[in-house]
Swiss-Prot record:
Protein source organism: Manduca sexta
Lineage: Eukaryota, Metazoa, Ecdysozoa, Arthropoda, Hexapoda
Keywords annotated in UniProt: Glycoprotein, Secreted, Signal, Storage protein
Function: Arylphorin is a larval storage protein (LSP) which may serve as a storage protein used primarily as a source of aromatic amino acids for protein synthesis during metamorphosis. It is a constituent of the sclerotizing system of the cuticle, and serves as a carrier for ecdysteroid hormone.
Cellular component aspect of the GO annotation: extracellular region
Family indicated by similarity: Belongs to the hemocyanin family.
GO molecular function, one term: nutrient reservoir activity
Oligomer status and interactors: Arylphorin is a hexamer of subunits alpha and beta.
Recorded superkingdom: Eukaryota
Glycosylation sites: 72, 211
Record-given protein name: Arylphorin subunit beta
InterPro entries per UniProt: Di-copper_centre_dom_sf (IPR008922), Hemocyanin/hexamerin (IPR013788), Hemocyanin/hexamerin_mid_dom (IPR000896), Hemocyanin_C (IPR005203), Hemocyanin_C_sf (IPR037020), Hemocyanin_N (IPR005204), Hemocyanin_N_sf (IPR036697), Ig_E-set (IPR014756)
Localisation per UniProt entry: Secreted, Extracellular space
Signal peptide positions (record): 1-16
Primary site of residence: secreted
Length: 703
């Protein structure tokens, strides 16, 4: 007798009863000229792994001659260098691309120069069309994303979510294989059998119910966090951050915010690690583990992921980092860390026309640049051969992939791509390690005095926070860019037939009500932070030990009137969060109405508002909110595109940008509020979907 146990949820799959909720989003109006250019920009993202001879870009790219149009570029030398490099041989099509390999990155920077230095949009589009036809797909996309984000004449243009452009980097291989098989079979043989494996047809497209990774991938406690570390919105957020400020980016050459670049680097990772720590706490995991370059790494990772060409490298638990193959790299990493500590012990750094005093809070710019090892650290007079990147070498060592076979052929690891890095537990351990060194520098800073933190005449009387509730809900994303189309299908403008459905963390909207009494009319800044209340053992956390775990939720200015002021802030209005990205199919429909999604146009580099809160528990997990009010002093510099990070003349994260004295945080312009985060509905996301295998019981062999 053989009994097959199938989850009751499969009935729901077959009936298609679980439909993702469509959330509203803000739109903005655009003119006809914008629409025309926006469509051209979007078209080059479509099905990038194959070219369509029928599309407009193909004919333009085929016929375009870069050298004949050299006068249409503002930096002829950069374009000539690109052409010289291109003629000596470029990354072939259908090879994997990663910016963490020198030759591949140098070529991609050359492609970016071709795009960036185009004098006008027409030249930019023709250059991009040429690259789309002739260059490697991943290399083209990497340079194209950054160029669209950075060019002045494409400001406000919408770029599609990375998970629609690279679906294979945002879903596990078992899900992608179902997509490929359905495409090759032109459908499913048995609808009932397909439903058992999470494949259903809805309207004119197929839906694939996808689980997050389980113990097969994370053969350790890290599997509890896969719903967060594999969230497509979170991983896209990281990709956008790199596109805003690539590590190879020279601020003087490209006009980025040089004076605070290192500070932005630090604050981004500090906030990301704080948010990750929240999720660890609510899952009972506690502090982010530490590791040594000279001891086995405990956290293994077996990614069930693959590019089109190679599977991802796997790292077992207790993997030996300090192997014969890595001796030189480990020595470099260790020396790099010790050199930084020596700089701190000296109290200053002087080299490459830089004089750094580590007692100055502005030294964070140098410190951040040092750990990113970016192009601003040494300046252009230093050759790139002198510079070895701590980040890149650490990623290669921890990724556990074998040495590249040649300059173009390598086995990828999750740490080789910004789209997949956040999946690997060692990513968090590596950047937590970097932050610990930066915190060593922070110890040199004088804590803010009680007088500097005070706001005379202003008192926060009370703070009321609505009930905080998280839940999981389905979301579909288009995976059609991952398949190859026949000539006939290409003529039909690429159908969008395949959608991956996952449960994603979300929360119910909530409001924060703040009662403030002011003695006079004054302009002020109001900040709202979230922080842990207890450690993983249940002991209250002291502020002196917890200052670097505060996660910024909101930042806004307010004109107080003399007397009582009541502020009500809804979570949907919190400054540094955005709506989910809109699918490309919907983007084209909006463009027909001369509209684009506001957040995708203006705020695409922000964290999805879904991820504002960590997953709660049935009984409520304790956290605390902190409201801080201080005088407003605007920063007069042009900060685009970094408004999300820099709003005034205070350091990022102020007042938690340095160690604190607990006693100084008991003032009238501050308020700590205890809160609990609850979870509604299924606690484990895999219960929404099909099991990773069909379970059998009472199996008796026939005699």
């Amino acid at each position: 007798m053989k009994t097959v146990i199938i989850l009751a949820g499969l009935v729901a799959l077959a009936l298609g009863s679980e439909v993702p909720v469509k959330h509203s989003f803000k739109v903005k109006d655009v003119d006809a000229a914008f629409v025309e250019r926006q469509k051209k920009v979007l078209d080059l993202f479509q099905d990038v792994d194959q070219v369509n001879p029928n599309d407009e870009y193909y004919k333009i790219g085929k016929e375009y001659n870069i050298e004949a149009n050299i006068d249409n570029y503002s930096n002829k030398k950069a374009v000539e260098e690109f052409l010289q490099l291109y003629r000596t041989g470029f990354l072939p099509k259908y090879y994997e691309f990663s910016p963490f390999y020198d030759r591949l990155r140098d070529e991609a920077i050359g492609v970016f120069h071709l795009f960036y230095y185009a004098k006008d949009f027409d030249t930019f589009y023709k250059s991009a069309a040429w690259a789309r036809v002739y260059l490697n797909e991943g290399q083209f996309l990497y340079a194209y994303y950054i160029a669209v984000i950075q060019r002045k004449d494409t400001q406000g243009f919408v770029v599609p979510a990375p998970y629609e452009v690279y679906p294979q980097f945002f879903a596990n291989l078992n899900t992608m294989l179902k997509v490929y098989r359905t495409k090759m079979q032109d459908g499913v043989v048995s609808a009932d059998l397909a439903a058992q494996h999470g494949i259903v047809k809805e309207k004119n497209y197929y839906v694939y119910y996808a689980n997050y990774s389980n113990s097969l991938v994370y053969n350790n406690e890290e599997q509890r966090l896969s719903y967060f570390t594999e969230d497509i919105g979170l991983n896209s957020y990281y990709y956008y951050f790199h596109s805003h400020l690539p590590f190879w980016w020279n601020s003087e050459r490209y006009g980025a915010l040089k004076s605070r670049r290192g500070e932005i680097y630090y604050y981004f990772y500090q906030q990301l690690m704080a948010r990750y720590y929240f999720e660890r706490l609510s899952n009972g995991l506690g502090d982010i583990p530490e590791f040594s370059w000279y001891s086995p790494v405990k956290s293994g990772y077996y990614p069930l992921m693959s590019s089109y060409y190679y599977p991802f490298a796997q790292r077992p638990n207790y993997w030996n980092v300090h192997s014969e193959e890595n001796y030189e790299k480990v020595r470099f990493l260790d020396t790099y860390e010790m050199s930084f500590l020596q700089f701190l012990q000296n109290g200053h750094f002087k080299a490459f026309d830089q004089k750094i005093d580590f007692h100055d809070f502005k030294a964070i710019n140098f410190v951040g640049n040092y750990w990113q090892d970016n192009a601003d650290l040494y300046g252009e007079e230093v050759t790139k051969d002198y510079q070895r990147s701590y980040e890149i070498i650490a990623r290669q060592v921890l990724g556990a992939a074998p040495k590249p076979f040649d300059k173009y052929t390598f086995m990828p690891s999750a740490l080789d791509f910004y789209q997949t890095s956040l999946r690997d537990p060692m990513f968090y351990q590596l950047y937590n390690r970097i932050l610990k060194y930066i915190y060593e520098y922070k110890q040199y800073l004088q804590p803010y005095s009680s007088e500097k933190l005070a706001f005379k005449g202003v008192k926060v009387v009370d703070v009321v926070v609505d009930k905080l509730v998280t839940f999981f809900e389905y979301y579909d994303f288009d995976a059609s860019n991952s398949v190859f189309w026949s000539k006939e299908e290409v003529k039909s403008s690429y159908p969008h037939d395949f959608k991956i459905r996952q449960p994603r963390l979300n929360h119910k909207p909530f409001s924060v009500s703040i009662d403030i009494k002011s003695e006079a009319a004054v302009d002020a800044v109001v900040k709202i932070f979230m922080a842990p209340k207890y450690d993983d053992n249940g002991f209250p956390l002291k502020l002196e030990n917890n200052w670097n775990k505060f996660f910024e939720l909101d930042w806004f200015t307010y004109k107080f009137v003399a007397g009582d002021n009541k502020i009500v802030r809804n979570s949907n209005d919190f400054l540094i969060f955005k709506d989910d990205s809109v699918p490309m199919t919907e983007l084209y429909k909006l463009l027909e109405q001369n509209k684009v999604p506001h957040d995708m146009s203006e705020d695409y580099g922000y964290l999805p508002k879904r991820l504002m809160l960590p997953r709660g528990t049935e009984g409520g997990f304790p956290f605390q909110f902190f409201v801080f009010v201080y005088p407003f002093n605007a920063d007069s510099k042009d900060l685009a595109p970094f408004e999300a990070f820099i709003q005034d003349n205070k350091p990022l994260g102020y007042p938690f940008d340095r160690p604190v004295v607990d006693a100084y945080f008991k003032q009238h312009n501050m308020f700590f509020k205890d809160v609990f985060v609850y979870h509604d509905g299924e606690y484990f996301p895999y219960k929404f979907n099909v099991p990773s295998h069909v379970m059998h019981s009472n199996v008796v062999p026939k005699h």
